């Protein structure tokens, strides 16, 4: 047999209850798999969303979804063929018939009839549905073709195999035997693939390799996997496929092994107190994992098992058996009596006859405004100082039986007899108290006591007819010392700016509002920026203390000068009132016109005329038109002309070519009232050409040293100081060789030097006053040249007195100054005398022989020295005394 003949002998699936013959599949034809469908419903009342059954349409394109349509608007057919109820439905007849339509890929229309039977009316399974009570058969063959279902050639087409869940075994258990007609030609081996075979969960289904028996190895769970799709394979002994793979669909049928589960353990809802019967409160929901399409294992019914409290009636609420909506069934809900209800709700499958579970529903009765706020107490008293706003007078207390912090509890206060709006009541959000305050200042002199009537309500209106509570509040106004009041608060006075100094301008007084007090008012000026005014402290009369000036633009704005006046009473405490005085200063012609600018530049070549503005600080008519005139010979070189009809500016230009330099021009300006003034213009002629804008005067050289010169001088001084410092350091480092003060022992010189004359008698009583008078000048001229003298302050020596009687005091004071003078002789330091003096009559002492000499000393020459050395000659010469 050739390859084409072998492929035409397709696999035959033999499902053997008896010997069915294999037949070759026919071409696929679109259509419903049954001409009619019959579904059974449990009762005559169906809720919205109830699943009735499923129809199936084959369009031969392999699509999983199909568009269905029904003329009966009570039902909905999904794209998967599931028929559901669109709205609540009640059966008036035991049967309902309607048609379901579908279209194939060529838009041909097909229809099937659907019949709904209530329980008890010919109740039997629909003929097109496979049994779910167990395994259909051990052996099956290809079913005969029908107008509603056509098989494509070369395909294995078998109905789904149903297998109940939760079977007890023993396992493995046979499901169906698969046979190929090729087993007559040779040995055929069978295998399966797909979910449950070689993909997770692996090993749920197995097939005997040689016999083709498909078996299940363990209990199935529909809630885990509802459908298994397997593919069977047939191969020869050499491993070659003898048939194409065949799809096997295994459907797990449901058992009621799952009880309903509420979506929440505790459901919470609320209802207004006093709600009418039929008012929906809340909805509870439960789910069931069992099949809710083909069985009633997931058909849940709701009931209320208990209610706590059972007051005022044990059945205050009811629940919709199918939807779980809880509603009010009787009147009497009162939040103040029973604020909450707790219901135990049950959900049971099999329409309430199967497995069940419970949950709790907590219903809160919300408040309505059925209790009015009541004042407690109903009378109040308070005091408030006059003239003070936003002052708390008293606190109003109310009680309300409604729920706190709700609109039915929040109080709203209203003053019934406050036409002037002088009081206000606000609500404390914490305790609902009313705070009575003044909205504006009260006047003790106008009214000393107020009696107010206050009513209280709630934010929301009363739900029932209730009486509004009211309270009476007595408010006493306390008198306080009030500040004097200026009348008017702002006073305008017109005065000429040339008003005489010391004259009274006006009188600005204040009134005392405290009519029950006798007080004295004192006036003074609080602000007078120009220091022009003074006031009589008793009468309030205001006069000038200096000349007024309207053109003082620092203090006068828009011809108005502002001063602040205060009035102080002598009450306790002292009160002060303020008034504003506005002096409107009228203008006088006290300012002559002036030119602007006063410094002007011209170019030497081709100069352009310059415009000069004329400015007058006065007001019209004391201003323009102005008159301009060149004076003091300025018209010889310059000319002016008016620039505008109002003569508020002039044009200045030279008459001839001028040399570069500075010029002074005298310009006389006069206003409309003949007030004139001569002003000197500074004119500079620059070395340039054209308009004045391009003319720039050379910058003068600044007098004195410039910064670079100053820096150079400072640098030179610094360099000189550094040089001197280096020289001093060099001199200090040089080794100073000094002669010893005493000769060494081996260098004895027997020379005698004459150091002045020692004779002459006692001279300590003969002093020269000029030496004392000279002070520091009396120091010897012999100074050290090896030690720099220390700079110290010079002591103060008294001058020689004219009176001889004071000479003693003069000597004592100057002696004290000399004793503390470190620069006065004698100096406490060794002095090196480079010059010993000349013209001494005595020979040098170095000629004397030392007493340590070995030879005899000859001292006879001492006799030749005169009387001053006679004593010495007698001592050493051996001569006798006279």
Curated annotation (Swiss-Prot):
One term of GO molecular function: cell adhesion molecule binding
Renumbered residue ranges of the record's region Required for binding CTNND1 and PSEN1: 758-769
Biased composition (Acidic residues): 755-767
Outcome, altering residue 370 to A: In a diffuse gastric cancer sample
Keyword line: Calcium, Cell adhesion, Cell junction, Cell membrane, Cleavage on pair of basic residues, Cytoplasm, Disease variant, Disulfide bond, Ectodermal dysplasia, Endosome, Glycoprotein, Golgi apparatus, Membrane, Metal-binding, Phosphoprotein, Repeat, Signal, Transmembrane, Transmembrane helix, Ubl conjugation
Region entry Disordered, spans: 747-767
Positions bound to Ca(2+) 2: 257
Effect of residue 315 to S: In lobular breast carcinoma
Impact upon substituting residue 637 to Q: CDH1 becomes a substrate for ERAD and is retro-translocated from ER to cytoplasm
Principal subcellular localization: other
Residues bearing the modification Phosphotyrosine: 753-755
Glycan attachment sites: 280, 285, 358, 470, 472, 509, 558, 570, 576, 578, 580, 622, 637
Annotated phenotype, changing residue 754 to F: Abolishes binding to CBLL1
The Cadherin domain, residue ranges: 155-262, 263-375, 376-486, 487-593, 594-697
Outcome when changing residue 473 to D: In a diffuse gastric cancer sample
Tissue expression per record: Expressed in granuloma macrophages (at protein level). Expressed in the skin (at protein level). Expressed in the liver.
Post-translational modification: During apoptosis or with calcium influx, cleaved by a membrane-bound metalloproteinase (ADAM10), PS1/gamma-secretase and caspase-3. Processing by the metalloproteinase, induced by calcium influx, causes disruption of cell-cell adhesion and the subsequent release of beta-catenin into the cytoplasm. The residual membrane-tethered cleavage product is rapidly degraded via an intracellular proteolytic pathway. Cleavage by caspase-3 releases the cytoplasmic tail resulting in disintegration of the actin microfilament system.
Membrane topology label: Single-pass type I membrane protein
SMART domains: CA, Cadherin_pro
Effect recorded for residue 463 to Q: In a gastric carcinoma sample
Complex and partners: Homodimer; disulfide-linked. Component of an E-cadherin/ catenin adhesion complex composed of at least E-cadherin/CDH1, beta-catenin/CTNNB1 or gamma-catenin/JUP, and potentially alpha-catenin/CTNNA1; the complex is located to adherens junctions. Found in a complex composed of CDH1, RAP1A and PKP3; PKP3 acts as a scaffold protein within the complex, the complex is required for CDH1 localization to mature desmosome cell junctions. Interacts with the TRPV4 and CTNNB1 complex. Interacts with CTNND1.
Protein name per UniProt: Cadherin-1
Native source species: Homo sapiens (Human)
Upper lineage: Eukaryota, Metazoa, Chordata, Craniata, Vertebrata
């Amino acid at each position: 047999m050739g390859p084409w003949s072998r492929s035409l002998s397709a696999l035959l699936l033999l499902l053997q209850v008896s010997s069915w013959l294999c037949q070759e599949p026919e071409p696929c034809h679109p259509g419903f798999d049954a001409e009619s469908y019959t579904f059974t419903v449990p009762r005559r009342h169906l809720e919205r969303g109830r699943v009735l059954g499923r129809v199936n349409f084959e369009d031969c394109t392999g699509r999983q979804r199909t568009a269905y349509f029904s003329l009966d608007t009570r039902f909905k057919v999904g794209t998967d063929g599931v028929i559901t109820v669109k709205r609540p439905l009640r059966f008036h007849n035991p049967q309902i018939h309607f048609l379901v339509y579908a279209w194939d890929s060529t838009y041909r229309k097909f229809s099937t009839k659907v019949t709904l039977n209530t329980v008890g009316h010919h109740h039997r399974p629909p003929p097109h549905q496979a049994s779910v009570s167990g395994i259909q058969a051990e052996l099956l063959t290809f079913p005969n073709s029908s107008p509603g279902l056509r098989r494509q050639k070369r395909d294995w087409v078998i109905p789904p195999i149903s297998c109940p869940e939760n079977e007890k075994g023993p396992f493995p258990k046979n499901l169906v035997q698969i046979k190929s007609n090729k087993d007559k030609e040779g040995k055929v081996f069978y295998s399966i693939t797909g979910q449950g075979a070689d993909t997770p969960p692996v090993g749920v289904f197995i097939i005997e390799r040689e016999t083709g028996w498909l078996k299940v190895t363990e209990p199935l769970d529909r809630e885990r996997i509802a459908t298994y799709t397997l593919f069977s394979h047939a191969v020869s002994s050499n491993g070659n496929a003898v048939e194409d793979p065949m799809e096997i669909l295994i459907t797990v049928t449901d058992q009621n092994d799952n009880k309903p589960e509420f979506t929440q353990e505790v459901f919470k809802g609320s209802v207004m107190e006093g709600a009418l019967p039929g008012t929906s409160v809340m909805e509870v929901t439960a789910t069931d994992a069992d099949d809710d399409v083909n069985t009633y294992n997931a058909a849940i019914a709701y009931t209320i098992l208990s209610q706590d409290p059972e007051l005022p009636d044990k059945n205050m609420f009811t629940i919709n058996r199918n939807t779980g909506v809880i509603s009010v069934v009787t009147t009497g809900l009162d939040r103040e009596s029973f604020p909450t209800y707790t219901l135990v709700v049950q959900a049971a499958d099999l329409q309430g006859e199967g497995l069940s579970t419970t949950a709790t529903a907590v219903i809160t009765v919300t408040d309505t405004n059925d209790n009015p706020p009541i004042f407690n107490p109903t009378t109040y008293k308070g005091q408030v100082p006059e003239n003070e706003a936003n002052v708390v007078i008293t606190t109003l207390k109310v009680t309300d039986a409604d729920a706190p912090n709700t609109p039915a509890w929040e109080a709203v206060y209203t003053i019934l007899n406050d036409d002037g709006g002088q009081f206000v009541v606000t609500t404390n959000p914490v305790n609902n108290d009313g705070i009575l305050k003044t909205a504006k200042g009260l006047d003790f002199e106008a009214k000393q006591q107020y009696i107010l009537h206050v009513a209280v309500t709630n934010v929301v209106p009363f739900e029932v007819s209730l009486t509004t509570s009211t309270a009476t509040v007595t408010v006493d106004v306390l008198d306080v010392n009030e500040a004097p009041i200026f009348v008017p608060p702002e006073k305008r006075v017109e005065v000429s700016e040339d008003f005489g100094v010391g004259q009274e301008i006006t009188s600005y007084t204040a009134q005392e509002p405290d009519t029950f007090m006798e007080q004295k008012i004192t006036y003074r000026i609080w602000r007078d920026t120009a220091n022009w005014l003074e006031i009589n402290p008793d009468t309030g009369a205001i006069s000038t203390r200096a000349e007024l000036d309207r053109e003082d633009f620092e203090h006068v704005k828009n011809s108005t000068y502002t001063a602040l006046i205060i009035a102080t009473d002598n009450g306790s405490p002292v009160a002060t009132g303020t008034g504003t005085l506005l002096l409107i200063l009228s203008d006088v012609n006290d300012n002559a016109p002036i030119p602007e600018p006063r410094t002007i530049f011209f170019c030497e070549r081709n100069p352009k005329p310059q415009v000069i503005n004329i400015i007058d600080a006065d007001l019209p008519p004391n201003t323009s038109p102005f008159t301009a005139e060149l004076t003091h010979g300025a018209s010889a070189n310059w000319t002016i002309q008016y620039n505008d009809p109002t003569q508020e500016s002039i044009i200045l230009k030279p008459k001839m070519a001028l040399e570069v330099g500075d010029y002074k021009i005298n310009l006389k300006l006069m206003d409309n009232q003949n007030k004139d003034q001569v002003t000197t213009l500074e004119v500079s002629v620059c070395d340039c050409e054209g308009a004045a804008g391009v003319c720039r005067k050379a910058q003068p050289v600044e007098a004195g040293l410039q910064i670079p010169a100053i820096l150079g001088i400072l640098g030179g001084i610094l360099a000189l100081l550094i040089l001197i410092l280096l020289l001093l350091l060099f001199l200090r480092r040089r080794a100073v060789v000094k002669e010893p003060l005493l000769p060494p022992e081996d260098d004895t010189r027997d020379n005698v030097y004459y150091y002045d004359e020692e004779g002459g008698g006692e001279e300590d009583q003969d002093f020269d006053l000029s030496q004392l008078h000279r002070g520091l000048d009396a120091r010897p001229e012999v100074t050290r040249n090896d030690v720099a003298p220390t700079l110290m302050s010079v002591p103060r020596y008294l001058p020689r007195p004219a009176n001889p009687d004071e000479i003693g005091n003069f000597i004592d004071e100057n002696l004290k100054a000399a004793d503390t003078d470190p620069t006065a002789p004698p100096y406490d330091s060794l002095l090196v005398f480079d010059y010993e003096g000349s013209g001494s009559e005595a020979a040098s002492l170095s000629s004397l022989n030392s007493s340590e000499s070995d030879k005899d000393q000859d001292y006879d020459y001492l006799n030749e020295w005169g009387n001053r050395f006679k004593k010495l000659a007698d001592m050493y010469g051996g001569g006798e005394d006279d």
